[in-house]
Amino acid sequence: MQFDIIGDVHGCYDELMELIDKLGYEYKRGSYDHPDGRLLAFVGDLTDRGPHSLEVIRLVSHMVKKKTAYYVPGNHCNKLYRYMIGRKVQVKHGLETTVAELNALSEEERIEVIAQFKELYEQAPLYHSFPEDKLVITHAGIREDDIGSYGKRVETFVLYGDITGETNPDGTPVRRDWAATYQGDWWIVYGHTPVRRPRIIHRTVNIDTGCVFGGALTALRFPEIEFVSIPSRQPLVSEKFRNFPG
């Protein structure tokens, strides 16, 4: 199979549409199709912080329903879902922007988009694995030994990365650089941690190039292992990007 795997969108709908066009997709029959039969995939964190989270929800949920795209949830998706089903969550760290968009809708529109997202989230796997391609699409990564497993420990890693339980001064969790020691045969394509440019190491590819923080929105063309990016229209927030050795 041939994929165009897109990093964390975070409500950057305009950049997403520009990227889809640059990748060669055409609007047909209510969805976006590629003339070569390629399929889009999303590594999660569709919403929060950016200006048009609900438009991203509408687009991705429609494409997944039409079976023209794959989606896996990220930690922001998980939090938004818990908010939508009435769980007590803190409306901050970006969620407040999506909630503001929801509150600006009519009741009918709000009910509709909540139903769309809940269906998208509830029907999504924790991660997608494609054995014939030796490919896993996940939000924050996965250990090779955990491919095929879906317990709570695996869920925590997939949504948040290899967290230590400690926190950084800005309140974010301290995460180990799991990719640096990965030795598996599977390609692991993920996002979650904003980097200045796509990071390939040991068959792992981080494609979160921090669009919502003024970086870029990036797609990995698989199996070619080529990158296609669109510059962000958002202001640059340099401190949000992580630098790795080498």
From Swiss-Prot:
InterPro entries: Ap4A_hydrolase, Bis(5'-nucleosyl)-tetraP_PrpE, Calcineurin-like_PHP_ApaH, Metallo-depent_PP-like, MPP_PrpE-like, Ser/Thr-sp_prot-phosphatase. It comes from the Bacteria. Pfam families: Metallophos. Its cofactor is Ni(2+). It catalyses: P(1),P(4)-bis(5'-guanosyl) tetraphosphate + H2O = GMP + GTP + 2 H(+). Keywords: GTP-binding, Hydrolase, Nickel, Nucleotide-binding. One of its GO terms (cellular component) is cytoplasm. Disulfide bonds: none annotated. Its EC number is 3.6.1.17. It is an enzyme of class 3 (hydrolase). One of its GO terms (molecular function) is phosphatase activity. Asymmetrically hydrolyzes Ap4p to yield AMP and ATP. Belongs to the PrpE family. This is Bis(5'-nucleosyl)-tetraphosphatase PrpE [asymmetrical]. It comes from Halalkalibacterium halodurans (strain ATCC BAA-125 / DSM 18197 / FERM 7344 / JCM 9153 / C-125) (Bacillus halodurans).
